[in-house]
């Protein structure tokens, strides 16, 4: 089985999407952008900040951080006050977190 090495350019950073640490960094950057976006409701920005802190906690394993963050993001994804562009970002973030191995 051939494994593809995908890279992703995000705000000038070259990220290796096969590396879970780089995927966590990408998620943190996405969450930071959401927390700074004034068009997103305050409660969703607060969850983005809390999720960012969970992903930055290096005391836990990468898989546990990803699973915890995914749970938090999933909880807020059904918020009826969320604008469409924010919901799209949430789905992209969830897809990235799901690609990180939990074990």
Curated annotation (Swiss-Prot):
Gene3D superfamilies cross-referenced by the UniProt entry: Ta0600-like
InterPro entries for this protein: Ta0600-like_sf, UPF0147
Family to which the UniProt record says this protein belongs: Belongs to the UPF0147 family.
Annotated protein name in UniProt: UPF0147 protein Mlab_1361
Organism: Methanocorpusculum labreanum (strain ATCC 43576 / DSM 4855 / Z)
């Amino acid at each position: 089985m051939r494994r593809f090495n995908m890279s992703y350019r995000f705000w000038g950073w070259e990220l290796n999407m096969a590396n879970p640490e780089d995927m966590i960094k990408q998620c943190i950057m996405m969450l930071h952008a959401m927390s700074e976006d004034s068009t997103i409701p305050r409660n969703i920005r607060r969850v983005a900040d809390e999720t960012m802190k969970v992903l930055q906690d290096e005391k836990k394993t990468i898989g546990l951080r990803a699973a915890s963050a995914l749970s938090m993001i999933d909880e807020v994804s059904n918020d009826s006050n969320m604008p469409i562009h924010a919901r799209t970002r949430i789905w992209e973030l969830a897809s990235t977190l799901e690609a990180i191995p939990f074990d």
